[in-house]
Amino acid sequence: MKDIKTIFKGFHRPLGLPAFLCPTGRLRKNEGKMLTKLVTFTDNCTYEIKKEKQGDWNKLFGVCFGILGIHRHSIRFGWRWNISKQKIEICYIIYDGKRIERTQIAFCDCELNREYHFNITWILKDDRTLDVTFHPLQYDVEEHLNVPIKARRFFGCGFYFGGKTRAPHRITAKLQQISKVI
């Protein structure tokens, strides 16, 4: 089933073609774009790794701008397992041109085996600035940001575990495309 994403032990992402190799669209001024997914984190999304890495963010989904934008110019939801809360924490991640995470603050929690809607909308305000909204639909939380970009062509960013740390065991989540206006 294509909605089920599995990252095998020792890997960063599900097998198959990386999402960033599949161009999804081009930005035009004042034209809105939207990506909404229904996400279910399964029991095996829990993990315990080295203490200094446990707080690192994994990637859920989003978009990057430009062919090499995956680590330089992207907007996406992030996730991590919080051992003390026994819940998945969700944040938004924005990379600037220096691959520095400017904002990584958990703004909602998810229980395992429940469905959650996540929505990202963006609109090109001027030649190089996006107005971005991150909205987990079950929560009364919405983040609006202005994000600088350097390219108008954008690509998908998919389910991913870690940075340098690889999946400690099989990690599975359901990411169902609900709407895609791009």
Question: Each predicted region: which residue ranges?
Answer:
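Surface-exposed coil/turn segments at beta-strand junctions on protein surfaces, enriched
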Residues: 30, 109-113, 125, 166
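Extracellular beta-strand elements of beta-rich domains used
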Residues: 37, 171-181
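Short, aromatic/His-centered strand-loop micro-motif at the edge of beta-sheets
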Residues: 92-117
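Flexible glycan-contacting loops in extracellular carbohydrate-active proteins
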Residues: 142-174
